[in-house]
C-alpha cells in the first residue's frame, strides 16, 4: 500500500494527466518540493490531522474512510505539511500603454438594448464588471510563426480575484472573414494549451534547434484558433490565488469569450466551437453549459469536440484492464497476473466512484481517485510504458516527449516573452501543484458526463479518440458515449461504427478510423493516434476536424 500513499503525495491524478509520467518519489522529496504556504480554508481543513475530522469522516463510506486511514497511518504527519494551493507565479504586470486594446467588462455590462417587447435589457448576460481583456497585436515576423496570419495575445483579468488568464489567437489561413473560430484547451489539469499549439495542432512546431517549423496540418488552415492557458497559474497565466475545480474556471472562460468577441465583432457572427483533450473532458461540458445558460450572449456556440477525454470515470476506468491486456487492438503490456489484479480491483473502484457520483463530495471523490488510480493505472505506469501511447516506452523527461522540452525552451526566450506580452517570469508545460489541487478538491472523479445530455439538446458533440492511447483510451470513450442517457440514446446505441476515410486529396479512400453518428452525438476512433491525435496523425486530424466544422456530421 506504500504506492498508494506515494501516489497521493505527488498527486494521484497525475496518472491520467497530460503529460505526467512520474510514479514514485520518496515522501520527504515530495514534501520538500511541494511545500509552500497557504491560508486557504480548504488547505487548513485538509491539513488537519484525520482524527480531528470527525464530522467530515462520518459521511464517508467504509471504503473511502479506509483509504484516508491508510494514508494517515503510513504518513501520520504528512497531511500537516502538504499545502493544497500553489503559490503565485513570479510576474511583472506590464503597463496599460503596452497593450493595443483594453476592453472593460464594466463598460460591456452597461450596454443596454431594447428587446422585441420594447423593454430595456442588457446586451449580453453574465457578471462581467470585474473583468477586463487586454489585447496585443503580435508581430508574426518577429517570431517566424505563420507570418501572413493575424495574431493577438493578451490577458483576461479578473480584478476582483487577482486572476489573469493568457490567450494567443491565430486567424485562419484560408478565409478569416467566414471561417469558424475555435477555442482549444489542453488538459492536465494544469497543462498549458500552448503545448497544444506547438506540439499538436498550431501553425508551428518547435525543432531541436529551438526554431519554429511550419505545420501544414494546423487547425488554423480553415479556422481561427484561440489557445487559452487555464486555469490560473498554468503556462503564462497567473494569480495570487488558485483554482481547484472545473466549475470555477467556467465563468472565467465565458467572460474571456464575451469580451474577445466584443473587441472583435467581425468574428462574433461566425460559428464558434470548443475543442480540447484529456482533462478537457471535464472542462468542455462545464464551459459549454455555462455559455449555453446565457440566453443573451455574443458567443455563437455551434459544437464541442472532446479528444481522448476523461468525462465518466465510472465507465471509463473499466476499460483500463482491456486496453492494457491486449483487448484494445494492440499487444498486451501487462502479464496475466497483473490483469487479474486489475479485474479484482474494478468492483471496489466502481463502488467508490458511485459514492463520489452520489455525493460529489471531496470526502468520497478523493478516495475514489486515489484507490482507482493506484489499482487500475498503477500497474501500467510501473512498466515504464508511455501512458499516452501504448506502442512506445516513456522516453526523455518525465513528460515522455523530448519535443515538450524544446517548446519550454522556446517560450522562455526573452524575445518570445516580450513579443506575446507574457507577464510571468517563466513558462512550464504543466503545473503539478494545480493537478494536485484538483485532485484534493474531488474534481477528478466528479460526473461531468451528466452535463452532456443538456448540451446535446442544443448543439452537436463529438467524442474522438486516438486508439493507441492508454490513459483516456478509445474503449472507455466509446463505452461512456454509448451508455449516455439522453433523448437520442436508443437511436445512437443502435448505430454501428462505419469506416472513416479521407475523401478529397491524393490519399482519398485511405481508412483513418471509424465513426458512428446519430442525432447530435458522434464518436470517432482514429487509427494510430495516441493521446494527442494531431501529434501522431496530423493529416487524419485535420481531415476529421475540417469535415466536422464543415457540418458533415452536424447538420
UniProtKB/Swiss-Prot annotation:
The active site is at residues 278, 469, 531. Disulfide bonds join 191-430, 325-339, 349-372, 356-365, 394-400. This is Carboxypeptidase Y homolog A. One of its GO terms (cellular component) is fungal-type vacuole. It catalyses: Release of a C-terminal amino acid with broad specificity. Glycans are attached at residues 222, 520. One of its GO terms (biological process) is proteolysis. The keyword Lipoprotein does not apply. Gene3D superfamilies: 1.10.287.410, alpha/beta hydrolase. Its EC number is 3.4.16.5. Residues 18-136 form a propeptide. InterPro entries: AB_hydrolase_fold, Peptidase_S10, Propeptide_carboxypepY, Ser_caboxypep_ser_AS. It comes from the Eukaryota. Vacuolar carboxypeptidase involved in degradation of small peptides. Digests preferentially peptides containing an aliphatic or hydrophobic residue in P1' position, as well as methionine, leucine or phenylalanine in P1 position of ester substrate. Pfam families: Carbpep_Y_N (PF05388), Peptidase_S10 (PF00450). It is an enzyme of class 3 (hydrolase).
Amino acid at each position: 500500500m506504500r504506492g498508494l500513499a506515494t501516489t497521493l503525495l505527488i498527486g494521484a491524478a497525475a496518472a491520467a494527466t497530460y503529460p505526467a509520467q512520474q510514479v514514485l518519489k520518496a515522501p520527504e522529496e515530495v514534501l520538500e518540493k511541494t511545500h509552500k504556504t497557504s491560508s486557504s480554508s480548504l488547505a487548513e481543513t485538509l491539513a488537519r490531522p484525520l482524527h480531528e475530522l470527525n464530522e467530515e469522516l462520518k459521511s464517508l463510506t467504509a471504503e473511502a474512510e479506509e483509504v484516508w486511514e491508510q494514508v494517515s497511518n503510513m504518513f501520520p504527519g504528512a497531511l500537516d505539511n502538504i499545502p493544497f494551493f500553489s503559490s503565485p507565479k513570479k510576474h511583472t504586470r506590464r503597463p496599460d500603454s503596452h497593450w493595443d486594446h483594453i476592453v472593460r467588462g464594466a463598460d460591456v455590462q452597461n450596454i443596454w438594448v431594447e428587446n422585441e417587447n420594447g423593454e430595456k435589457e442588457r446586451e449580453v448576460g453574465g457578471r462581467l464588471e470585474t473583468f477586463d481583456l487586454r489585447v496585443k497585436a503580435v508581430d508574426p515576423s518577429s517570431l517566424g510563426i505563420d507570418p501572413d496570419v493575424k495574431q493577438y495575445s493578451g490577458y483576461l483579468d479578473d480584478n476582483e480575484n487577482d486572476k489573469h488568464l493568457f490567450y494567443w489567437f491565430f486567424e485562419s489561413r484560408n478565409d478569416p472573414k467566414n471561417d469558424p473560430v475555435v477555442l482549444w484547451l489542453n488538459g492536465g489539469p494544469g497543462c498549458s494549451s500552448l503545448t497544444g499549439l506547438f506540439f499538436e495542432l498550431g501553425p508551428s512546431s518547435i525543432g531541436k534547434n529551438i526554431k519554429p517549423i511550419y505545420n501544414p496540418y494546423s487547425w488554423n488552415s480553415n479556422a481561427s484558433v484561440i489557445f487559452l492557458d487555464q486555469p490560473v497559474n498554468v503556462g503564462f497565466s497567473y494569480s495570487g490565488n488558485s483554482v481547484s475545480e472545473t466549475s470555477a474556471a467556467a465563468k472565467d472562460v465565458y467572460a474571456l469569450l464575451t469580451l474577445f468577441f466584443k473587441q472583435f465583432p467581425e468574428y462574433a457572427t461566425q460559428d464558434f466551437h470548443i475543442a480540447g483533450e484529456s482533462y478537457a473532458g471535464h472542462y468542455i461540458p462545464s464551459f459549454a453549459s455555462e455559455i449555453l445558460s446565457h440566453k443573451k450572449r455574443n458567443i455563437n456556440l455551434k459544437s464541442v469536440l472532446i479528444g481522448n477525454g476523461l468525462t465518466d470515470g465510472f465507465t471509463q476506468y473499466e476499460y483500463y484492464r482491456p486496453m492494457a491486456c491486449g483487448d484494445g487492438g494492440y499487444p498486451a503490456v501487462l502479464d496475466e497476473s497483473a490483469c487479474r489484479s486489475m479485474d479484482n480491483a474494478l468492483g471496489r473502484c466502481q463502488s467508490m466512484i458511485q459514492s463520489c457520483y452520489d455525493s460529489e463530495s471531496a470526502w468520497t471523490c478523493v478516495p475514489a481517485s486515489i484507490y482507482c488510480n493506484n489499482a487500475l493505472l498503477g500497474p501500467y505506469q510501473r512498466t515504464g510504458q508511455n501512458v499516452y501511447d501504448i506502442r512506445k516506452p516513456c522516453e526523455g523527461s518525465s513528460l515522455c516527449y523530448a519535443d515538450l522540452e524544446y517548446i519550454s525552451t522556446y517560450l522562455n526566450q526573452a524575445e518570445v516573452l516580450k513579443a506575446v506580452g507574457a507577464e510571468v517570469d517563466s513558462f512550464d508545460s504543466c503545473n503539478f501543484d494545480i493537478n494536485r489541487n484538483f485532485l484534493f478538491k474531488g474534481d477528478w472523479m466528479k460526473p461531468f458526463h451528466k452535463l452532456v445530455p443538456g448540451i446535446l439538446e442544443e448543439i452537436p458533440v463529438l467524442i474522438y479518440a486516438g486508439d493507441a492511447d492508454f490513459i483516456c483510451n478509445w474503449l472507455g470513450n466509446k463505452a461512456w458515449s454509448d451508455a449516455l442517457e439522453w433523448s437520442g440514446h436508443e437511436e445512437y446505441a443502435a448505430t454501428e461504427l462505419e469506416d472513416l476515410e479521407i475523401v478529397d486529396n491524393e490519399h482519398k479512400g485511405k481508412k483513418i478510423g471509424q465513426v458512428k453518428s446519430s442525432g447530435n452525438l458522434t464518436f470517432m476512433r482514429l487509427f494510430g493516434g495516441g493521446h494527442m491525435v494531431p501529434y501522431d496523425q496530423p493529416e487524419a486530424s485535420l481531415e476529421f476536424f475540417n469535415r466536422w466544422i464543415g457540418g458533415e456530421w452536424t447538420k
